[in-house]
A protein has these predicted regions:
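Conserved catalytic cores of phosphodiester-cleaving nucleases, focusing on short active-site segments
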Residues: 85-106
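Short, solvent-exposed loop/turn segments at secondary-structure junctions
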Residues: 64-66, 105-108, 142
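Charged phosphate-binding loop/patch that engages nucleotide di/tri-phosphates or the phosphate backbone
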Residues: 2-23, 170-195
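Mg2+/Mn2+-dependent nuclease catalytic core
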Residues: 101-128
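Nucleic-acid nuclease catalytic cores
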Residues: 123-153
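Short, electropositive alpha-helical surface patch
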Residues: 147-169
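Positively charged, polar, low-complexity stretches
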Residues: 52, 67-70, 78-81, 88, ...
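Acidic-basic catalytic patches of nuclease active cores, encompassing PD-(D/E)XK
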Residues: 17-78
Length: 195
């Protein structure tokens, strides 16, 4: 079974249609990204259960505005502040912080998916000796790449590009093996690139 076969299987649920009044054939972009993150979360659980590392999904702090006390449910809330990156943790004594991005485009990841407050945070992680990278899922190609933040940010700043090309990511990133367990084995790439 190849990487493409495995990712196609994982992304199969991403092709479900979201019905709305304007376009009943539109694909839910939020669900597509959440499925990718769910696969990362499952991989992280496996890593933790096997005592390989401790990497967790970071939650974005919210301020509760209204709550239904009978059902013990939040009915209205706002984000307190911007989030930093999606995941953080420790592997072999080194701090890790990374962001996960998914695109349905075959040739690029739009730059508007990379937020400046996250870039600032990830640069600080690097400045203090941590490991910072992006996991980029080209779901149409059934390929996931790990790309180091320093390499990515230098490219963005030097080219003034509006998107990050697939060719750049393929050339400068590292293909992540897809398996049954762990689903997205990015830890193997981290061992090769950073240790």
């Amino acid at each position: 079974v190849t990487n493409k076969d495995l990712l196609a299987l994982f992304n199969k649920k991403n092709t479900r249609k979201k019905r709305n009044s304007d376009n009943p054939q539109s694909i839910s972009r939020a669900n597509r990204g959440m499925d990718f993150e769910n696969d990362i979360n499952i991989s992280n659980d496996w890593y933790r259960e096997n005592n390989l590392c401790s990497i967790l999904k970071r939650t974005t702090p919210i301020k509760v505005l209204k709550m239904d006390s009978k059902e013990k449910r939040i009915t209205s809330a706002v984000f307190e502040k911007q989030s930093t990156a999606d995941y953080n943790g420790v592997f072999r004594g080194r701090y890790i912080d990374f962001e996960a991005k998914s695109t349905m485009l075959k040739s690029s990841l739009p730059l508007d998916k990379i937020k400046m407050h996250q870039v600032k945070h990830l640069k600080e992680v690097i400045k203090h000796g941590g490991i910072a990278f992006y996991l980029i899922n080209f779901s149409v190609r059934s390929e996931i790449y790990l790309i180091d933040c320093t390499c990515l940010f230098n490219h963005i700043e030097s080219t003034q590009c509006k998107s990050i090309s697939y060719d750049f990511v393929k050339t400068n990133g590292h293909l992540v093996n897809l398996k049954y367990v762990p689903r997205i084995d990015y830890l193997e790439v981290i061992k090769t690139v950073y240790f």
